Structures are given as structure tokens and as C-alpha cells.
From Swiss-Prot:
Keywords: NAD, NADP, Oxidoreductase, Pyridine nucleotide biosynthesis. Transmembrane segments: none annotated. It catalyses: L-aspartate + NADP(+) + H2O = oxaloacetate + NH4(+) + NADPH + H(+); L-aspartate + NAD(+) + H2O = oxaloacetate + NH4(+) + NADH + H(+). Its EC number is 1.4.1.21. Pathway: Cofactor biosynthesis; NAD(+) biosynthesis; iminoaspartate from L-aspartate (dehydrogenase route): step 1/1. Specifically catalyzes the NAD or NADP-dependent dehydrogenation of L-aspartate to iminoaspartate. GO terms for biological process: NAD biosynthetic process. NAD(+) binds at residues 124, 190. It is an enzyme of class 1 (oxidoreductase). This is L-aspartate dehydrogenase. The active site is at residue 218. Belongs to the L-aspartate dehydrogenase family.
Amino acid sequence: MLKIGVVGCGAIASLITKALMSDRLNKAEVLAFYDGNLEKAEKLAMETGADFCRSLDELVSKDLDLIVECASVTAVEDTVIKSLNNGKDVIIMSVGALADKDLFLKLYKLAEKLGRKIYIPSGAIAGIDAVKSGSLGKISDVTLTTTKPVHGLKSALEEQGLNTDEIKEPKVVFEGTVFEAISKFPQNINVSVVLSLASRYPAKVKIIADPNAVVNRHEILVKGSIGTIKTCVENNPCRDNPKTSALAAYSVIRLIKDLSEPVRIGT
């Protein structure tokens, strides 16, 4: 049995937990929750029968195998460091934090030193297995074009001074590097960092706000010595959190299942 603790108790954490609870094979179980908003953690703990923790330190000190970070980019560093130092492996959902090269290296070296693992799920995009394999050759270009409903980008756009009510047709709201993208859209474009890490090449990112869109669309183009990789995924937004795709949560569930099963498919 894989014993799991969860940091961050929003819609994604709830979806992951309930999916694992419904798994008939029962090879993984969420046993404890923590959130900076204690009411959220207590509510999810009561709904699932798991432990409610009042601090991150309390959570990572428990008898757990794996910590799943579902909180925010700002929570990643503290969560991962404390988890690793307490003998736990970690899944990072807010992978945008790893656009910070210094932080990535810091966490990488700590995990290596302690003999622990940091897992980064593929998230809401397809083709990461092929991109990882292709990165063993020479990559010459990586491009991500993401189209989302305006309401899914609303908070990030308004922070940049854009009136989302004035967007009446598809509008390019960002075009630049992965580092700029995750800085301006920290809750919307984690996939750009996953893609960049998998390819070992900084992705060029374009974000389109579409008032008529009902899905989150991610188009990937990777060119290199292995040839060309093109993928396009149209994801349904998470029902309770339209900033992200339901597939992002399912990628974590699949990863947890892979960790608890004897056969793993794919790179």
C-alpha cells in the first residue's frame, strides 16, 4: 500500500483523492491533508476519513511514502525540501516553480543526496514520452500554443490590466519564453515548464484567450534530429477549477497508479 499525504486541498486534490478511494485494487491511499487554509484541509479530511494536519511539518512527519503537492508555485520549495528531508518522495503539480533554474538544481541535488525521488507528471499535454526520448538527440525548436476560454485566464489577465469583457474574439494575450509565460500565468501554463524540462529546451509559448472556447487546447511542435513531433490535445477544464484541465489531475492519478503497480507502460 502506497501511503500518501496531500499539500493543497482544492479541486484538484479532491479529484485525485476521490479517484484513489474508488480504485478497487486499493494499492494507494491518501492518509493526511494539509493546506494553508486549514478549513479546506479539515473539510477534505472529514469527507475522506483521512487525518487533518495543522502544519506542513505535522504532515511530513507522519508515516507516509509520498507527498503530492497540489498547492501553488510558491508552496513548492518548502513542501519539497521538508518532504525530502523527512524521507518522503514528492509529486509536484505546480511545476511552474521549476522554471526557476536555481530552485530546480537545489531540489535536484537534495533529492540525489538523500536518495529520494521527485516526480513531475505529464499534466494536460500529450507526447511527453516521445519528447523525453527525442531529447537524447538534438532538439532545435520547441513551441507550445495554448488556447483557453477567457474565464479560465480571467484573473491572470486582469492582473495585467486587461479587461476580459472586451475580448470578443480569439486574442493572443501572450507570446514569449517559457520563463515569461509562467511568471505572468502561474496557474495556467504549467505545461510549458513540463515541456521544457522534458525536451531540455526552453519552449516558445503563445497563449490565446478565446471567448467561444469550451476546452483547453494545447498544441505542441518539437523539431530535432529525431524528426518532428506534433501533438494537439483539447481538454475539458476541471469542473471546479477552470484554470486547469481535468487531464492534469488524471495524469497525477495515473502516475500514482504506476508507482504502485508491477508493470509500467511508456517511457
